[in-house]
Regions:
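Metal-cofactor-binding active-site regions of metalloenzymes
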Residues: 1-115
Length: 115
């Protein structure tokens, strides 16, 4: 058990799309028929990048696997479940409708997935 689990926490700035775990990323990639290069993963549980430019490049690759409102729903649930397990009681999540729009989602369907 993590010794800080008993302390209530706040996540005051997080980009929802950036919370996707490598496991969920691989799952969405398979489901949405997106081929991913294994060099984006440092391990089963982490991503790998060399510098900020590489981070942004790989962030865009990772977010490219999110295609549907259902993907956003699963991503949101997964992230908030992890927050609850770590006693995070307050979250200010930033969401990017730009990624959703690039995949053909309307703003309304995107929000339905997140909410």
């Amino acid at each position: 058990m993590n010794s800080t689990n008993h302390i209530p926490k706040a996540e005051i700035h997080v980009h929802l799309e950036a919370t996707i775990s490598p496991e969920l990323c691989r799952k969405f990639a398979k489901r949405n028929k997106v081929t991913l290069s294994e060099d984006i993963f440092g391990s089963r549980y982490a991503y790998a990048w060399d510098d900020f430019y590489d981070f942004i490049k790989k962030y865009d690759i990772v977010t490219s696997v999110i295609h549907t409102p259902e993907d956003y729903k699963e991503l949101t649930y997964s992230y908030l479940k992890e927050c609850a397990a770590n006693n995070v009681i307050y979250v200010e999540a930033m969401i990017s409708s730009t990624h959703a729009k690039q995949k053909g989602m309307s703003y309304h369907s995107f929000l339905e997935g997140v909410i």
